[in-house]
Structure formats: structure tokens, C-alpha cells
Amino acid sequence: MKKKKSNYIIALIIIYLVLVYFFNVISDHVNIKNIGINKTSDKTFKIISSTENKDIEETLKKYAKENQIDLQIDYAGTIEIMDKLNNGENYDAVWCSNSIWLYMLNDGISVKNSKSTSINPVVFGIEKSKAQELGFIDKEVYTKDILNAIRENKLKFSMSSPTQTNTGASAYLGFVSTLAGNPEVLTEKDLENDQLKKELTQLYTGMARSSGSDEFLEEMFLNGNYEAVVTYETSIININKQLESQGKEPLYIIYAKDGVSISDSPFAYIDNKNEEKADEFSRLQKYILSNEGQAELVKTGRRVWYGGTNENADKTVFNPDWGIDTSKYIVPVKYPSTEVIKKSLGIYQTELRKPIHTVFCLDYSGSMYGEGNNQLTEAMEYILNEEEASKNLLQFSSKDKITIIPFNTNILGT
């Protein structure tokens, strides 16, 4: 086991979790569109929102109540939101992390009047003493400078999964673009470049821990012993507030000079041919974009100014000691087409990420007889079928190790 420690991240997946997730995925694709699950009522205005918007919920619900809008907000990760909408769950508006995901919705979903509500860079946050050691303080840092620090085993970082979260995907696409030399348009041919793949693989050798959600990443970082994290600027601001309240060293934010991934937090209407809902959406969107609504977003560490710059930004939020300079223009990464995004994420899943060792413990006890056993079989057929699993970027790579342990009262086959 020690010999394989550097090559494998060992994950134990308990089968009831597998069933809950994968059977739900299967059920979604088979049944949801037919039965109209979660169809919105005539009165309730339903928003499906990325989890990072929870900190603005109280303000938005207060406005809705004062303006006779019966508002319901459901939260999920951005990529999960796309799955929910594509699988037929009905909402009146979507408030996701990044506009790139709206282009991945099915053609039958009519999304209108999408407007960016804030700007949130996805950046490196490094312990200030470590950033000083690396020579990153008060210096223009490029992605290859970070890569070199990782190559020399001087830097380890944590981040969310590129295939399951917006922050992970956005950061990854930023790495791809900058290491490819920032082409005017990133193409599928660019993704096949062996040197690019080599550098991306080297960069991800520095990933000490990965998380399936941004919320867990923040919690994991605060409770662990990590020297760097890749996440939203807003998240690092929140992490630093907590670190300083505990008397701990804050993180120093690095904005790569050659390009930073930006999340634009679009708020968009899902047209269900309901004039009353369209009017309610318009009022909610106008409030979010009003001076009052934007001021509430700024309090949480979001940038709402043109180009993300404002020399008069609140220094208690955008603290210069943390490497934040709101007077400087952030160079945004150019996102590629939807097809190239899908291709690049597939390459990460099958070629670039660290190999994993997944252990499936399959329950064949009497309580699983009948429907339970059928669900178990369907779940395993789904996750082990590369073509099916790849639809949700859950496929294994040839480097992964899979162990299956069937059991009832005892482990079977021993």
C-alpha cells in the first residue's frame, strides 16, 4: 500500500450512496421528462441557483416579500443545475456561476434575458509566508511560474473537481488556455498537443486534495493543514476573515498575469410562457442589478464594477494585505466553444487527473431482494459503462483501480 500511496487517492464509496446518486441519474434520464416532476406552480416563482448565492438569499427574499412575489430558491452546484434542467425539472429562472454552462442546456429549454450580476475571479490563494518564499508577493506571476513551483515540489494546493464544479472547471479551462499560449480561439486540435498535456499533468501533481463541492472545499481547507487553494476570490475573502479571527495566517491571492478565469454569475429567465412569471423575473433581475442589490453583492466580496476595477472599493472587504488590488484590471481567460469545453473536461477525466482507487461494497443481503437488487444492477451498469458514465463526466480512466466487494452477512467469494 505504501508503494502505491503516491499514485492513488483511495476512495471508499458505500453502495447506498452509489445507488442514491446513480439510480437517480438513471431515473432522471428515463422518467423525469415524462412525468413533469417539480413542475412550478402558477403562483410560486422558482429559482434554481448556485450554492454560492446563499449569502444573498435573505436580501432577495425580503425584496420579494415586499413586492408580493412568492419566491422559492433551490440550491445546487452549477453542473448539477444543468443536469436538473436538462432532465426536465421546471424552474422559472436560473442563477448559475458562469454563462458557459447556459450554452450546455438542451435546445428545448428557452433561456432569455440573461444578464451578469457580478464578477468573481477564480484564483490561487497561497499562505502569505509561502507566497513570499516563492517570490510571488508584489510581482507579476504567470501560470508557468506556478507550474514551476509545483514541478520543484514547492507548492501543493486543494481545489474542487473540474468535472463536478464550476470553480474546478473554470480554473482548469484557465490553465489549459494560458499553458496553450492564450490562442485567439482554443480548438480541439490545441487539446491534442503533447506538451500541453504534459504541463497540465505536471500542474495537477500539485493537487493535494480535491472536493466535489465549493462549500466542502472551504470547510476542508479551514479544518485541514493546506498551504494553498484554488477557488473564488469571494471564498478566499471569507476564508481569510475566519483565519484572521482565529489568529492564523491569511492567504495571499495570486491573479495570473496571463489570464484569470472569471465567473459572471448570470441571472436568466426560463420561458414557460407565463406573462406573470416574466414580469416577476424582470422585477427580481432589476433589483439584483440596482444600486441596492449590487451593494449587497459587494458586501460578500463580489466585484460589480465595469472591468472588475474600483479604486474606492471597501478595503475591509477587498483587503490589499491579501493581495487584492481592485484598481488593477484582471486579464480574463477567453472561454472556448461548448464542444471544446466538453472535450477538454473529458481529457481531464480520462488522461490528466490523478488515478483513483475506488472500492464498491455491494449489498446482496436479503433486504436488497427484488427492486433493490435491480437498482443495484442498474447503478453498476451505469457507472461501469464508459459511454454512459461519460455523459456526466463520471467515467473511469485506464489508470484507475476498481475493487468490487460483494457482501451479505459476510463478504462473498472468499
Give the positions of each predicted feature:
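N-terminal segment of the mature folded domain
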Residues: 36-164
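Von Willebrand factor
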Residues: 353-414
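Acidic, polar low-complexity linker/tail segments
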Residues: 7, 30-32, 306-359, 366-374
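Ligand-binding pocket segment of bilobal, Venus flytrap-like solute-binding proteins
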Residues: 183-255
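Periplasmic-binding protein-like
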Residues: 116-124, 150, 163, 197-203, 245-273, 278, 287-308
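Ligand-binding cleft/hinge of the Venus flytrap
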Residues: 61-65, 143-216
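Extended ligand-binding regions for polar small-molecule ligands
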Residues: 128-140, 264-299
